[in-house]
Amino acid sequence: MAEVEIKQENVVHSRPRLITDEEMHYCPGCSHGTVHNLIAEVIDEMGLEEDTIAISPVGCAVFAYRYIDVDWIEAAHGRACAVASAVKRLHPKKLVFSYQGDGDLTAIGAGETIHAAARGENIVTIFINNAIYGMTGGQMSPTTLLGMKTATTPYGRDAALNGFPYKIADMMAHLDGATYITRQSVHTPANVRKCKRAIRKAFENSLAGNGYSLVEVVATCNSGWKLSPVEANKWMEENMLPHYPLGDIKCSKLPK
């Protein structure tokens, strides 16, 4: 059958140009793929393909460099913001962002992340928060909810034993060097559009030299949560979003 040529004015949606042909390794229903698409679309629309340097983490997104066709550096576990800070200082006109999960960012990388924000580094962090260690078997992370069952909290997270989950975005909003802090999701079409706008705003904030930006994406991990993709979205709405409410947390200018 001959291919039907679709006129550009009739295209409703197409594969983002900067998404490679590599088959993504993510589980069906995972939020990572959607966020990858949004990042690729925003970079393309801003004309930054040749002026972007991204830092990939250790975790489920360790192979992000295979999927988005820009320059990447693979950082040691938790050190993405430290690497991004150095790269941005060496290449101040480039868009530099790190892409990290809740294990890489809020556990082993908490110090590097918080201090990058405190210094007001002109970088962006895309933070995927699914409240579990997806790559290593579904263990508890710092953002795991109270009562949430994981491989290391089979009876549910207990504050007396495991401590409380913490909201790193809210914490970082108190830092003068962090000027744009937002929390989004991609579990509905409307939320996907809002998340895309937030990513673009963060990139623009960085390029304007206005300090550190964090886009937290409250995400699902249906395999780690032992739920179907549909059930995971519902569980996230009912349990994650009350604890991690969506919206802009801080939008300001660097202090003089």
What do the predicted segments below correspond to?
Residues 51-54, 94-97, 122-126, 170, ...:
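Structural motif
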Residues 1-134, 197-201, 208:
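Thiamine diphosphate
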Residues 1-12, 16, 21, 207-256:
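Flexible, low-complexity linker and terminal segments
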Residues 14, 93, 141-208:
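Conserved thiamine diphosphate
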Residues 110-115, 135-149:
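Active-site-proximal loop->helix
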Residues 70-73, 116, 141-145, 231-234:
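Short, hinge-like loop/turn segments at secondary-structure boundaries
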Residues 58-60, 130-132, 188, 217-224:
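Glycine-rich beta-alpha junction loops
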